[in-house]
Regions:
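A glycine-rich, often tryptophan-bearing local segment used as a flexible ligand/cofactor-contacting loop or short
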Residues: 506-590, 596-602
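Catalytic-core region of carbohydrate-active enzymes that cleave or remodel glycosidic bonds
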Residues: 226-241, 262-267, 271, 281-354, ...
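Active-site mouth of glycoside hydrolases
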Residues: 50-265, 350
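Extracellular ligand-binding/catalytic regions of CAZymes and related secreted enzymes
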Residues: 378-394, 432-433, 471, 598, ...
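The substrate-binding groove and active-site-proximal loops of carbohydrate-active enzymes
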Residues: 79-90, 114-131, 165-181, 205-222, ...
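Aromatic-rich peripheral "rim/lid" segments of glycoside hydrolase catalytic domains that contact
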Residues: 182, 349-408, 414-426
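Helical hinge/lid and interdomain linker segments adjacent to catalytic or ligand-binding clefts
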Residues: 454-543, 688, 713-728, 732-737
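Carbohydrate-binding surface patches
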Residues: 404-456, 461-466, 501-504, 518-520, ...
């Protein structure tokens, strides 16, 4: 389950290849046909259940029997046998797990196809492994829980990696023979289960790059591997959607990020473990910023062009109270639903049994023992109860004709971040060149050099993007992440928080120079553009766009903005104060010289700090200080009223942008699944206090009702608004119709 970020907390310097000994030596020289110890039983009931209907994607949601639905469940690692369940096969115990999952409202379960068990020797497939999977398929039909198999599993829990014994040090994402064998095994899965309706989708693997080669995997390797494995499956299987179970690849700028694999898969996954990304989420587990993690990662991945599913999410009750874990997951499940998640698959179904504590990987990673929504002996923890209510609630949603509402704000993602490393297609070069272009920043293009990493620049970009995303939500606006060469001009507002406006060798953090020509045309045509700049900022043609230009750097350790003109709910004399996190050009602000712009606020030295400009049919707002960067590193910054969102709200009002639905409480996120005449408003309270919320709409809504696990309850409207009570880190789904 642990991704690269998580493993930095717990893994040892040596990879535990010796753990393969638990699986593989037992296979050598052994008859792999069924024996009494591995016998695959049939489900206990003699009454056949109805078969699960086939599932497909319609581009927005999963569909079965012609109706959209949200598959919800968790990852299954048995409590007693853990990752050794194929060799410690216990059909009765496994069926008891499926019965419990059915009781909790599971409609999907993700599970591991251990590579060393399915392919003990190169190209030699274990019939027992497939017979065991057949048994799991039969349980899926009986208990009406779709299977979501994850292929090529070596690692899943802690730092452990159960390797195939015949790899012999070869890179599984790069070695030609390994790629051939992996593609062939994928084809074998496709051949066996091409028409099996109990499988909801194939997951190519969990949290790639494979942990044993994580730091050695390039963009090209990830792209080629995904392409080949998908081709292997598609040789026989044309039915099932395909996903790669990635974790943190977008926020960490990993090689398996959504933009790299988009041409080959049907959907994306996110594993929003915010507690293991403290650089982005310097907060308590149960916090405002932390509970925006799922929605943020979903929006970031959606920008690459496919729907997104929450694959793994949660926290361990060995580290946090069960009640806080339940509230954390609850808020993120509903927030993710509003962001457009097409399913939820938590980590994980059960705690580990106490006997597992005495051996690796649980021996070395105590926190791994308590991630379940149930205890090891199938008793409900608070998360199980919250999950069951969530399952019952979303099962009542009619998603026909609905889609996540379009964003009001586009936070543009630089092409240098999105494109595969080594792609020169947007370099402005045409035709053949007698003297080839070579960039020293492309690293591996130089003999003997590896693909460079720019983790600091990526952190700078992601933290500011996350901050802008939350500020937009608090201002009642939806933000998404169109790519630099994408359709960003379709949004009424475009936001460019620093470092998107920066310059420098870490190109992935900022847009290309010619972007600003397009931005000016966008504004002239009626768009609304906000930007913040730091001392590292560089904007060609800045004066013509913002009515002001950079004249120098503005070093300092503290910044105070004082409003000198009314702006939104700001009055002259109002102030905002910020601490500058580092003495660097990434944190210092800028001295700007105003031409046509209007000064709205000045800094502590009376210099222009916020300026507005009108250009053609559109408007711009410029901050001379990187406000989003200032907030990004402050622990728990959103767990108390944070006034910076008022700047976003003021720009919204000045631009005349109105969201379809809006809350009067900045801490209550409002998102929408929207249709022509009906839809759902998802309200999530990201605070530790109960909120009595007034929700207003600009639509001619006639009826609203709250959708709950036990049914829908009408809500009385007052004109075009209504009031609703939402508990701390809780949520409400409100159905509306015109």
């Amino acid at each position: 389950m642990l991704d690269t970020l998580r493993r930095t907390f717990i893994r040892s310097q040596a990879v535990l290849l010796l753990l393969a000994m638990q699986f593989v030596p037992a296979l050598e020289g052994r008859d792999l046909s069924l024996d009494p110890q591995t016998e695959v039983a049939q489900p206990s009931s003699k009454t056949p259940a109805s078969r699960l209907p086939e599932v497909h994607l319609d581009g927005t949601y999963f569909v079965r029997n012609g109706k959209r639905f949200l598959p919800v469940g968790a990852h299954w690692v048995p409590a007693k046998a853990a990752m050794e369940w194929p060799t410690e096969w216990d059909p009765k115990d496994i069926e008891a797990d499926f019965a419990k999952m059915h009781e909790l409202g599971f409609s999907i379960v993700r599970l591991d196809m251990l590579w060393a068990w399915f392919e003990p020797r190169p190209g030699d497939y274990n019939p027992t492994a497939f017979q065991q999977l057949d048994y799991l398929v039969s349980l899926a039909h009986k208990y009406q829980i779709y299977l979501h198999p994850s292929l090529f599993i070596g690692g899943e829990v802690g730092e452990a990696w159960w390797d195939v014994p015949w790899r012999l040090g070869r890179h599984p994402h790069a070695d030609a023979d390994m790629l051939r064998l992996e593609s062939n095994l994928a084809a074998e899965f496709g051949r066996h289960y091409a028409n099996e309706s109990a499988i909801v989708a194939w997951d190519l693997t969990d949290e790639p790059p494979f942990w044993i080669v994580g730091d050695q995997t390039t963009d090209a390797m990830a792209i080629n591997w995904t392409h080949l494995i998908v081709d292997g499956l598609r040789k026989y299987d044309k039915l099932h959607p395909i996903v790669v179970g990635t974790s943190g690849q977008e926020i960490d700028h990993g090689p398996f990020r959504a933009d790299d694999i988009s041409p080959f898969v049907d959907l994306f996954s996110v594993h929003p473990f915010t507690l293991y990304a403290p650089d982005l989420f310097p907060d308590a587990l149960l916090s405002a910023r932390g509970t925006y993690g799922a929605a943020f990662e979903i929006a970031l991945s959606q920008g690459a062009g496919h729907p997104v599913m929450i694959h793994e999410m949660g926290a361990s009750t060995a580290q946090f109270s069960p009640e806080r874990v339940a509230a954390y997951d609850r808020a993120q499940m509903y927030s993710g639903l509003g962001a457009g998640s097409i399913g939820v698959d938590l980590w994980c179904y059960t705690d580990a049994a106490p006997e597992q504590f005495h051996k690796v990987p649980y021996l070395r990673t105590p926190q791994e023992t308590g991630w379940g929504m149930t205890t090891w002996d199938r008793q409900d923890k608070p998360l199980a109860r919250e999950f069951k209510k969530f399952s019952q609630t979303v099962s009542r949603l009619d998603l026909t004709g609905l889609a996540p509402a379009p964003a009001e704000i586009g936070i543009v993602i630089p092409d240098e971040w999105a494109k595969p490393h080594g792609d020169f297609s947007h370099f402005g070069l045409t035709g053949p060149a007698s003297i080839p272009y070579l960039s020293t920043q492309d690293g591996d293009a130089m003999p003997g050099q590896r693909q460079p990493t720019f983790s600091n620049a990526n952190q700078w970009l992601m933290s500011s993007a996350l901050t802008a995303f939350i500020l937009a939500r608090q201002a009642g606006l939806k933000a998404d992440f169109p790519r630099e060469y994408g359709d960003w001009a379709k949004r009424p507002m475009l936001f460019m928080p620093s470092p998107i406006t920066s310059t420098g060798d870490a190109f992935l953090a900022h847009v290309h120079s010619d972007f600003y020509e397009k931005a000016r045309k966008y504004v002239e045509s009626g768009g609304f553009l906000y930007a913040s700049v730091a001392s590292d900022g560089a904007i060609p043609g800045m004066a013509s766009l913002f009515g002001a230009r950079i004249v120098d750097r503005a070093p300092g350790s503290e910044v105070t903005l004082k409003f000198v003109e009314p702006f939104g709910d700001f009055k002259p004399g109002d102030t905002l104060h910020y601490s500058v996190p580092t003495a660097s050009i990434e944190s210092w602000g800028t001295l700007i010289e105003v031409s046509s712009a209007k000064v709205i606020a000045v800094d502590q030295d009376g210099r222009p700090a916020l300026v507005t400009n009108t250009l053609g049919k559109g408007k711009t707002l410029l901050s001379a200080y990187p406000l989003e960067h200032y907030l990004a590193s402050i622990p728990a910054v959103f767990d108390q009223p944070e006034p910076t969102q008022r700047i976003y709200a003021a720009f919204r009002d000045w631009a005349g942008i109105k969201a379809a639905f809006q809350s009067d409480q900045p801490s209550v996120e409002v998102s929408e699944l929207q249709g022509d005449h009906r839809g759902y408003v998802i309200l999530v309270n990201h605070s530790a206090s109960a909120q009595n919320v007034t929700v207003s709409t600009i639509l001619p809504v006639r009826n609203v009702s709250r959708v709950q696990a036990d049914g829908s309850k009408p809500i009385e409207m007052e004109g075009r608004s209504w009031r609703i009570q939402i508990d701390p880190f809780d949520a409400a789904i409100v159905e509306w119709s015109k």
